[in-house]
Every structure is written in structure tokens, then in C-alpha cells.
Curated annotation (Swiss-Prot):
Protein's name according to its UniProt entry: Acetyl-CoA decarbonylase/synthase complex subunit beta 1
Organism annotation: Methanocaldococcus jannaschii (strain ATCC 43067 / DSM 2661 / JAL-1 / JCM 10045 / NBRC 100440) (Methanococcus jannaschii)
Transmembrane segments: none
Cofactor requirements of the protein: [Ni-Fe-S] cluster
Reaction it catalyzes: Co(I)-[corrinoid Fe-S protein] + acetyl-CoA + H(+) = methyl-Co(III)-[corrinoid Fe-S protein] + CO + CoA
Amino acid sequence: MKIRLYGETMVVGNIIEGGKTVLNLTKEILEKEDENLKVSYPGTNYNLPIIYGLLGKKIETVKDLKELINSLEIKDEETLENALDAGVVTLICAEAIEALKYAKSEKPYKEPYVGFIPDEILRGLGVPLVEGKIPAILVVIGKVGDKEKLKKLIDDIKKRNILALLVGDIVKEMDEADIEYGLDKLLVPVGNEITSAIHAANLAIRAPLIFGGIEPGKTEEIIDYLKNRVPAVVVALGELDNITLAAGAGCIKAGVPVITNNEVPVIKGALESSDIDNIVENALKMKGVKVKVVEFDIPVSVGPMNEGERVRGPDMYVELAGPKSYGFELVKVVNKAEDKVEIIGKDIDEMEEGSRNPFAIIVEVSGSNLEEDLEGVLERRIHEFLNYIEGVMHLNQRDQVWIRINKNSFNKGLRLKHIGEVVKQLFKEHFPIVEKCNVIIITDPDKVKEELEKAKEIYKKRDEKTKSIREEDVDVFYGCVMCQSFAPTHVCIITPDRPSLCGSINYLDARAAAKIDPNGPIFEIPKGECLDEKLGIYTGVNEVVRERSQGSVEEMALHSALTNPCTSCGCFEAIVFYIPEVDGFGVAHRNFRGETPFGLPFSTLAGQCSGGKQVPGFVGISISYMKSPKFLQGDGGWERVVWLPKELKERVKDAIPEELYDKIATEEDVKTTDELIKFLKEKGHPIVKKTEEEVVEEVEEEKEEVKATEEEKEGIEVGELITKLAKEGGIQIIMKNVKIVINLNVKR
């Protein structure tokens, strides 16, 4: 039965009825199942997330589920508290029903629906969420019922670059309206049935576990985290049945507010009503999220929602630069730019369809606080800004640049002038220190060649300058607390030899960011006195970390995984983990889906140190740090690395000492620590020799100690020795002249 709701009492009653319906249905479903059937979701270390997160209970079989579900009850009295509790029961039951689907089928969801969203994807969303690039997550449930209103709703979501998790009839409506969706567009169809909404809820519930480091079962802490740190809102559209209302109540209880285009009793910040035309903006207000929407006077859309778009050969109108032509991109700081866009050569409509053409884009920027050292940092943003443009695909950088423009955008009227205007506007929008900006686009072949040679000289000078910078050459490091919105005690330290662990910020990036926004999340750290050069311990770093971590971290070693390692949030590209059986290290990257020699996947290992924790033996890192000359130097560097996934090993091949490359195992070489030990011995890894030498050294030291003790004891009468030991208490063993005396009754 579907109804519209106007009174608080009626809503409470509907929620309780909906919760009871779901609870009874779940009991009936479970009663028919084999108790020994294993239940879990693929790709997560937090099974089953809602139950594990809120209750701290690990569910492994149908029997476990039955025991839990049969212990649940919903009170009849129509109070708000009982309704919210009924909502939580509804979420738990939905989790049980959905988990059963995965127990019976490897892939219960067929396209276009995705169902359960793995940890890997959530971790991948971490950086854009903390940066604010993805400002919010909207769980959109139900049906719009009007094609034009649907288009406006989706447009409002897209131009704000919001991640939308779609449940119910809205997906079919989007199909009928020819609106594209997918993770690359941040419009994710989760499922058609209301129980599939649990996959949006269990995505949210994993945020405090993964990024916040909160222990499962600490319900109040998890709810507080969701309420104050996760920018998620449920948008319930169209007529709502009792079960949908109950699920919504569960979300409210868990700290995720609900907004609907129905008339409902308002609970400010928890349950609100809005007309559909303004529902996106009002949803953001419930979480205090402000998004500035920049308008562009061009014939196609512009924004982060277009990033990741691919232009395949059959869809391509023209290709600019790329492997079969030539070109470059360059940013130059000049004395006085004029805010102009200039095209030298043919525009797109003068090029032959399907052709490949030389291309250059030169961005000249001026401003009182700009300096030459910022050119490279600004230049890397060209890639991002061009990919903001609908129908434009930009790959690579510098003189390897490769651009394609698709037929649809060309037919809508997109031209080079528009591309130049977007780049100019975005540079000024994103970088307030850029006061004026010229964009010069060149397609004339001879002119591109001429300017290309000049650009190569500039690249060369930059690289020489950058390569020469080391930690010992600078007085200032940089800190980043961007991730504290998710991991409150995490402080990332960025040096010339250690990029941010998310991999997105190097030393020059951090320097530019601190200069552009002195009050922002990236800031200077005077490095102070070096206490240990090998480990990378500095007084200035310790002072800042102590203050910014709320006193939870006293000291931090920049280049060690064993001695006071750096804290980790949840966005790291890879994790270093200690393998005690071989006294060495393994490194697993985020995209590795297999198991390490421990028998554990990346997600499990990552859970050991994420959330801003400092855990000796585990540390999150960026992949680019593996190419640093100071990589784990406090622990022995590459000579202590014994295991890498094959894909990662290939990616960092140039950084691995040549004589070590074949001696480092991959998942194809070993599956267990026993196999790893055997592999390292066969290959003659330095760690084997080091371990053997240490054992010999320890034995020799023990021999010397025994000898010294015997020499010390010579001349001492046995009686004296016994008296002396007796004062110390305990069992006395005297091995002088092979005489053994044992006293079990010595009093202190």
C-alpha cells in the first residue's frame, strides 16, 4: 500500500509497520536456508558491514544470521524512538536478505545494476571526497515521474560533481530519457529493489571503519562519525511505502539525514521536505555543504563529471598531437598577461574528420605572487581542466600530450576558442594568485615545431632543478591535514623525498598549495633539528604532528615502517607490511586483489593502520615514494623488500636495484610465508645472508657472555655464589664444576 504522509503519528506508525513487515519476511526467508551456508560480500574486509559496524558482530553463516535476526524485536508503542529503532532493524534485515543473494550467486546483480560496492572503490573515492572534488554522496531512491524534472535533477547533481547512488525506478526513467550513467559519471545504479539500498548504506558505514579507524561495534562513535564527517544524504522521491519509510528511519538513526519531495513532519537536519526543483541544493544544506557552480558560455557541459570520459576511434572527430603527430603543453609565468584567447592555425571545423593534427597549448599567467617555480604545478592542471570539457579526452603531459574530441561535442558546436576560454576561466577560478591569463592554442605545424623546441629546453631546466632537491637541501617541509575530515588524527608529511601517501601531492605541489592558500589544509613545517637522518626524525615535524594529531602521536620517522612510522588515513596507494618470518617487508598496492604471503588481501592489511593510527610494522605510502632514494632507508631500503605484486613490481621496476629484481617474490612465485622463505634462500636474497650473519653474531655474543661470566665466577666460593643468588630469589642454577643446586623455596 502506498500513501502520502502528513502527520507525525502516521509516519511513526508506518515506520513501525514497515519494520515489522521486513523482520517477518527476513525470518521466513532464513528459515528455508541451509544453516551452514556461508554468507559474505566480495571485496570487503568488513563483512557484513551494517551488522559488523553497528553491532560488532561477525557473520559467517546463515546460522549466525538466524540467531541475530531471531533476537531482534520491534516495539508496538508508536514513539519516535521506537520508530528509529525499527529503522535500524530494517537495515539489518535488508543486509541479511542481500547477503543471501551473494551466498547463492557469485554475481546476483546484472547490468546496469552494481549491487555491493567493494572496499577498493570506496578507498579510491577517498581522495576526491576529502579534497571536496566530490562534495557529497546522495542516495536517490524512488521515481521522479516527469522527464524534464528528471533531467534537471540529474543536471543539478552532475554540475556539482556529486556521487549519486541510484535505487529503484529512477534508473529506468534515466534509460527512457537517454541519460548516461556509470561510476565514471558518478551516477551509479545500485539496484531496483528497496533492499538494494543497503549497498549505499553499507558503503557509508565502512567510511568510519576504513578512514576513521573506529572499531566495529562502537555504535555511538560510528554514528557520530557518519553524522559529522560523511557528507551523505538520502533523497527519497515519489510516493513512499512503509518499508521505504522504515529504511529511511534506519538511515536517520545511523546519522544519515533524509530529504523527500513528500510532505513530512520536519526534524531539522534529519528529516526534511523540499520541492524537487531545489531538492539537491536543500539536501546539501542539511550537511552544511556549499558548492560553487561555475557557468561556462560554451555549447557543451564543463565539470569534473566529464573526467574519465574516453573517446574511442569510431567516436572521434579529430585527434590533436598524440603518438602519431606532435605537440606539447606549457605554462609560463609572464609579467603581464591580457586575459586573451588566441588561435594560431586551423580550428577544428577546418580539419578533416578523423585526422591527426599537430597541437600546442601555451598558458601565460601573471600575478604579483606568482613565481617561476610554480609553472610545473600549474601546468599539470591543464590535463584536469581539458578533461572537464564534455567530449574532450586529454592524456599525458608536456610533449607527450594526446587529445581527442568526439563527434557529438563537435556537432554541438565545440571549437578551440571554447576550449581556450574554459582553460582561462578555470585557471583564474582555481588559483586566486593568477590575476590574468592568456591561452594560446597553436595548430599550425611549423609554429608548433618551433615552439616545441623552446618548450623542451624549459622542461629540461625544470627537471634538473627538481632532481637536485633533497630533504637536506631545504629548511621547510609541508604538512597536509586534508584527510582529517575522515581521519582526525592523521597528519601527512610531504618532503622532497616523500610525496603524500595518496600519491597526488609532491613537494612542489605542496609548496604551491601553501602559497596559493596560506590558511588551507596544506601548510609549512619548519623541519627543525635532525634527530636521526637515517630514520628521518626532525624536531619540527614532531612538534607539528604532536599538535595536529591532538596529542595522539609524539614522534614520527619519515623513512621507517618499524620505528614510529608515519600515520595513515585510508587513501594510501600502497601499504608496507612487516613479515617477521623473514625479517623483511612486503608492499601491496590498492588495486591488488589477490592475497599476500600472510594469506590476507590488501583491504585487511590496510585496516591495520588506516584511520590516522601509527602502527609499527605497517605504513601507508604512495607508489612514487617507492622510487625515492630514501625509500624505507631507516629499515634497510630495498634490501629489506622481499615481496611485491607482479603489477606493482613492474611499475616500479626502474627503482629496484638491478641485482635485486629477480630476488623479490610476487604472488606468482609464492603463496605462503614458508614458500617465501624457500624462494628467498634459492634466489640468494640479501635478507637471507643478513639474517644468517645476525644469528651467527648473536651466537658469538652469547658465547662471549658465557665465557665472561665463567671468568668472573672463577675464584668465588660456591657458598658465596649461592648466598648472592639467594638474595635475588627464585630458582638458583649453578653450573660451576658441573655442580647443580636448585632451590625452590627461596624467600625474597
